Amino acid sequence: MATAVWAAARLLRGSAALCARPKFGSPAHRRFSSGATYPNIPLSSPLPGVPKPIFATVDGQEKFETKVTTLDNGLRVASQNKFGQFCTLGILINSGSRYEAKYLSGIAHFLEKLAFSSTARFDSKDEILLTLEKHGGICDCQTSRDTTMYAVSADSKGLDTVVGLLADVVLHPRLTDEEIEMTRMAVQFELEDLNMRPDPEPLLTEMIHEAAFRENTVGLHRFCPVENIGKIDREVLHSYLKNYYTPDRMVLAGVGVEHEHLVECARKYLLGVQPAWGAPGAVWMLTAQWHSTRGGSSRWRETCQMSALRPPRFQSSHIYGGARELLLLEEDFIPFAVLNMMMGGGGSFSAGGPGKGMFSRLYLNVLNRHHWMYNATSYHHSYEDTGLLCIHASADPRQVREMVEIITKEFILMGRTVDLVELERAKTQLMSMLMMNLESRPVIFEDVGRQVLATHSRKLPHELCTLIRNVKPEDIKRVASKMLRGKPAVAALGDLTDLPTYEHIQAALSSRDGRLPRTYRLFR
């Protein structure tokens, strides 16, 4: 018993001693287990004895110059050096779906799928890929409405091989019957996938261009129509290539290469070379200049009268409203880009984290005030001689009329007072996006190639940033007012039972408040 009492007393004394011992040092110093101390300085105060850091300053000026050389045959060679072992280079051609007015629609789509197939030097696509693999390279071909781009990223040491391969792919494709038949299957599959895709954006983009430009230049279909898949053959492709794949319509662009070496390779493989389709001709040559275009509407109704095994694809209604830009003045391009950034927008649900563009007009005026809106996003489609500023909105089919009225009000407000705070925020976002994208080598390549193809020169990032900073509220009002004087373009997808007529939408855009004309029905 005495032993137990003594043990309990000793335990209590030990606990008291432990409780009395301080867990930490004094407020100014803390103690290591070894007995040493270190100063307890808050993280908001600089450490004593540490030199002040010198941060790098960003002036937006690139360290390497963009050089352009024109060969005797008219082909332009543009390059910009960049630190690193790898390079990105390719051939950009002034061709695309906008030049298919006198041809079967879908040729550019076919050529995109046929790219990097067998050529005069390479028996198959596998042989091309194996050749690129020796230099750690990858290849790709992309076509848009006004540009076709063949690109390769590879080790800079294989520059001569890559330029020779690109020249062979562009100028000497075999276009065998087997390859064309495989391309027909690939195009058919892509069209089926496009029609089953839950995202309506690609279809709406095609529809709004068709509504705005009406079978004219950029209004022509970018994808091959189903009825033309079986009609496009080698003869049709050669006829198109003969007119548009000419040296004066091409740019060989490279990033991460020496300009003199690139020019030397271009002279070796692209100067005085006879293409597979023979001498160039201009039987059906079309210029990029667009003719009389007008606004309009494009609809695709999809109702519930479908098989029970396949519910309607679009259970919401999608409206794509736009107005055509008259970009005949080069100085209008930057204000339109700032206006698009100022409108901003997005979806009602963001999987990428909160806070992106939450102060843009479409977020503040539309998504934050109307909980039933699924999406409200501004898009800017820009081309050499024209453009299109659009707003994509989606909501429940029962809210279609109200949604259209909200969007027409936002279009009218574009030409009204511009707040300086929102303008500065939009300009800062645009410059930030520009500089962030130009950190990527493939993006620099595309920027160099497209600018030289369109203007024979390149505006450097710091020049573009200066133009963006100089945009004033009067510039936004000027370009918006000029845009709204034209006829609107409307594309609609989904259940469109309550969609207002095109005439009512046009009347709303011509009014002061953007309200649709009231309609009265005796029976519902």
Swiss-Prot record:
It comes from the Eukaryota. Pfam families: Peptidase_M16, Peptidase_M16_C. Keywords: Membrane, Mitochondrion, Mitochondrion inner membrane, Transit peptide. The keyword Mitochondrion applies. It is found in: Mitochondrion matrix; Mitochondrion inner membrane. Transmembrane segments: none annotated. The modification N6-succinyllysine is found at residue 63. GO terms for molecular function: endopeptidase activity; metal ion binding; metalloendopeptidase activity. GO terms for cellular component: mitochondrial inner membrane; mitochondrial matrix; mitochondrion. Residues 1-32 form a transit peptide. The keyword Transit peptide applies. GO terms for biological process: protein processing; protein processing involved in protein targeting to mitochondrion. Substrate recognition and binding subunit of the essential mitochondrial processing protease (MPP), which cleaves the mitochondrial sequence off newly imported precursors proteins. Belongs to the peptidase M16 family. Heterodimer of PMPCA (alpha) and PMPCB (beta) subunits, forming the mitochondrial processing protease (MPP) in which PMPCA is involved in substrate recognition and binding and PMPCB is the catalytic subunit. This is Mitochondrial-processing peptidase subunit alpha. It comes from Rattus norvegicus. The gene is Pmpca.
